[in-house]
Amino acid sequence: AGMVAQPIAMDEQSLLSMIDRRVELANTDDANSSRLLLLILDGITDPRNLGACIRSAASMGVDAIIVPKDKSAPLNEAASKTASGGASLVPVVSVVNLARCIGQLQKRQVWVVGTLLETEQMLHQVDMQDNIAIVMGSEGKGIRQKTAKCCDFLVKIPMVNADLGFNVSVAAGIALYEVQKQRRY
């Protein structure tokens, strides 16, 4: 059996310091290269789904993944294996209070975009050129109401058969791709 990549843990204070540095950079330097992309996972309890989200995040250049301490999958071997090396590329930040953390992001010029099934605005209709945090919820329940209330935008991913829906890692990949598409192409 091969070695499983060790996940990078980062605390909330280190995350906020990193964001402060990046926002400062964006004001002086080439704004394109210093724009933030964060992924917030609200209530993802299956380690394999967590791992698959980490893999999608790593593929799409996410700077950090934020998860709540409670009701969140452990970053265990199953998660790391599913992440296929992505766990060593993207820090995972476990926070005590997700709503408060989102508020801290917003104070630092990060737009927070929540994904829901039942909302009017489509993912591609939001301008994602600035610092962005994408919020994904659990497949069963979606993002919590308290989390949704904190978001700057609530969007849905257009689907042909919406009653089937996507696995959360697939939905995360689509949302992150949309950010990169708007920024790069």
Tell where the protein language model's regions lie, with residue ranges.
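Active-site/ligand-binding-proximal alpha/beta "capping" segment
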Residues: V113-V168
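Acidic-enriched and Gly/Ser
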Residues: S14-L15
